[in-house]
Amino acid sequence: MKKFIFCFLCLWTLNIFAASKTYPNKLNRCKITRNIFNDYEPKVFETTNNLLRKTGRLSKFYGERILIKGKILDQNCVPVADAKVYLWQVGSGGKYPYEPLKTRVDKRRFTSKSDSSFTGSGIATTNNKGEYYFISMLPYKSSRYLRSANIRIEHPSLTTLETRLDLSDKNMCDNECGEVNPILIEPQENMPSYCFDLVLQGTTLKRY
């Protein structure tokens, strides 16, 4: 009887500490970010990651400056280098300050009459750590529209992703997230930062 009880306890103990077959392996599998599409992307994107002004122009904008940054990963959680990242959003007045790509859209959501230097769009390329960042401004918020930005990531080896970034307090982070050019961002500036790690479908490497 004692031998039976001892064997039962051993099997019960092993069962407690055994890994479940359904336990998610977070070491080599990341949850793919879902697509959320937006109809208001610009006809022409600005070729800089600073949405506050065009290249070579002085900045003159009305609103709070923010930093949007994070990492791009493939579905095996490997950082994706040399991915093209496109960002577009409204300004503090709630309108897109550019000409839209699509013609059948609500034209009331766009404006070309503004003395602000805010461009509303930009492009970044991820570094070898998969990191990206944009200098932007806090967009307009109302009962109908939450503060958000739209983003699209393209890479020749991965499925293109387009989604929406929720610029709420839950996604705020410190300045330790990613590498930022110290020339553009002074260390003493208390700029609100929002971090987003995005996962694309596919793999960039054949072997790990």
From Swiss-Prot:
Enzyme class: oxidoreductase
InterPro entries: Intradiol_dOase_C, Intradiol_dOase_core, Intradiol_RC_Dioxygenase
Keyword line: Dioxygenase, Oxidoreductase
Matching Gene3D superfamilies: Aromatic compound dioxygenase
GO molecular function term, any single one: oxidoreductase activity, acting on single donors with incorporation of molecular oxygen, incorporation of two atoms of oxygen
Coiled-coil stretches noted in the UniProt entry, renumbered to this chain: none
Entry's EC annotation: 1.13.11.-
Family affiliation: Belongs to the intradiol ring-cleavage dioxygenase family.
Listed PANTHER family: DIOXYGENASE, PUTATIVE (AFU_ORTHOLOGUE AFUA_2G02910)-RELATED (PTHR33711), INTRADIOL RING-CLEAVAGE DIOXYGENASES DOMAIN-CONTAINING PROTEIN (PTHR33711:SF10)
Protein name in UniProt: Putative dioxygenase RF_0617
Organism for this UniProt entry: Rickettsia felis (strain ATCC VR-1525 / URRWXCal2)
